[in-house]
Amino acid sequence: MEQYVIKGGRPLEGEVTIAGAKNAALGILAAAVMTNQEVTIENVPNVRDTRVLLQAIQGIGARVRYIDEHTVAICGGTINPNTNLCVDDEYIRKIRASYYLLGALLGKYNHSQVALPGGCDIGARPIDLHIKGFEALGAHVDIANGMISVEADELIGSHIYMDVISVGATINVMMAAVMADGKTTIENAAKEPHIVDVANFLNSMGANIKGAGTDVIRIRGVKSLHGTTYSIIPDQIEAGTFMVAAAATRGNVLIKNVIPTHLEAITSKLTDIGATVIEYDDSVRVMCNKRLKATNIKTLPYPGFPTDMQPQMAVTLALSNGTSIVTESIFENRFKYVAELSRMGAHIRVEGNTAILDGVETFTGANVAAPDLRAGAALVIAALVANDFSTVCDIKYIQRGYEKFDEKLRGLGALIEKVETDKEIQKFKLRVG
């Protein structure tokens, strides 16, 4: 079983380049099947989730061609619409974004069938908002035997109000509506940057979407979509993870290929606790040479503090001077890292959707397990700070969303290696001392 072995206590220093946004890529890759012409997508992150989704896209008959490690060409014209368009295999059930193929295939072919989605166990993420949106457009939805089936004689534009702000439902309904007859309005839409990116991608294919990035999205249906070449935006969560890692290890890191406006909530909190953040046109530098201050954080939909950065920021607050309060308002099961972090010496208690963190001077190396993607990244940051050696197992979760995470950290001076056996761990320990 692959795991990371890490010797902590070294500040991160140097430069790191951020990959394309995983959450944007998953929506864009799914939407690429909505035209019969070839689509070329650049800056695709080479992570497990995107690879699995591309396998599923090939599985329904689309042609997928890798131009290079981060560029892929997709042609949906080879899909046979007379099949049941069933997306079901052992891989697709492991990623939550499999449901984007529901909206994409429904929008193009008026029917699709996809396995119930998986992903990280961070709490209930029901698909009722997706279903409500599809039904408002005229589709019939059936759930049976672990599969979701959607079918419509014709999709008709509609007014859709999202009862709860949902990134996934906003993207899915937006895709389903782009070729519906008439106008669709999505109210209380999510505003995350990757929603804007998916909308921009669809517009580059000939869709007519306005208002993405606001809470009201307006879509005028078009007859068909055409091919395009499109580059995915940088990943704000990967960027934020390296920003926090730089601050936690008291380092000095230039984080390249970012959109600083997408990072404002993270930048604001890092500045509040005493780190220095310098913004450039497409990069940010994070510096810290002292113990940071405590603060309070509440996760909120964009442009608020992102839930996907809560575990990483909690690691930094667990090292701060004072008591911090972290309130999780998006997912109810996002404190699974607390037990693991406590093994490293953190003082954290959880009360409902709130964690109270009494800062400690440093962490002690320990053997810990990644419970999910972002918590896994947080535990790696903790291990980079800790005295002595740590191992982080179950890194399959981390590999879902971070490309070459260990390689990028080594480029910043971290002592980290991906290993599979106890013998390899011992060799690493002997080598680094």
Model regions and ranges:
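Short, structured segments at the rim of ligand-binding sites
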Residues: 1-433
